Regions:
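Extended C-terminal regions of large enzymes
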Residues: 2-190
Length: 190
């Protein structure tokens, strides 16, 4: 059938078609970036590196926009959770910055990329960062492994992980120009 705005039954039907890869659902099952390209309008895809923009509109939190654009796995709010600082959530309150300003967001995003590469490696929930910081992560790591890493050493491990992922992406064909937000986020008002 035809999709129309507000047609809830059509939404249910197309969801089933996507699951069964039937009709138009076969194209939509590929994700919004591929579907938009297939239908001749790649500019309509709200995606980075083929992954759809999740969770937060980057026009309201500039650091999140940089994080989406530079995430090694495409738009992902879990690779550098800058809202912890942009919204002043502890323990990163000392990093609090204006969410609507660009100033300092590159450095902020890099800190969170490194922190979250560490927390991913420790298999910790990202939301534990609302109550814990790198000192707590380091203490936990040292307690479990019997090692004696400093916060700086563990952050360096996070940086290496992130850079290794970046290198893998380069080998897979990502190049300069892959780290971008869709133009609708950079050229249209929110």
């Amino acid at each position: 059938g035809k999709l129309g705005w507000g047609d809830t039954q059509a939404m249910v039907n197309v969801t089933e078609d996507i699951a069964k890869r039937k009709g138009i659902g076969d194209k939509l099952a590929e994700g919004n970036a591929r579907a938009a390209a297939y239908f001749g309008h790649p500019e309509l895809a709200m995606a980075v590196k083929g992954q759809s923009i999740p969770a937060y509109d980057p026009r309201g939190m500039k650091g999140m926009g940089i994080a989406y654009a530079t995430s090694n796995r495409g738009a992902c709010h879990l690779r550098a959770y800058t809202p912890a600082a942009e919204l002043g959530v502890m323990p990163f309150g000392s990093l609090k910055v204006d969410p609507l300003e660009w100033k300092g967001k590159g450095a902020l995003t890099k800190v969170f990329q490194d922190v979250h590469a560490v927390s991913d490696s420790l298999d910790l929930c990202k939301f534990s960062a609302f109550a814990q910081g790198m000192q707590e992560y380091t203490d936990q790591f040292n307690a479990v492994t019997g090692m004696n890493y400093s916060v700086e050493e563990l952050l360096r491990c996070g940086e290496r992980i992130y850079n290794l992922e970046r290198h893998y992406n380069n080998l897979a064909g990502f190049r300069e120009g892959s780290d971008y937000l869709p133009k609708r986020f950079t050229h249209e008002p929110s």
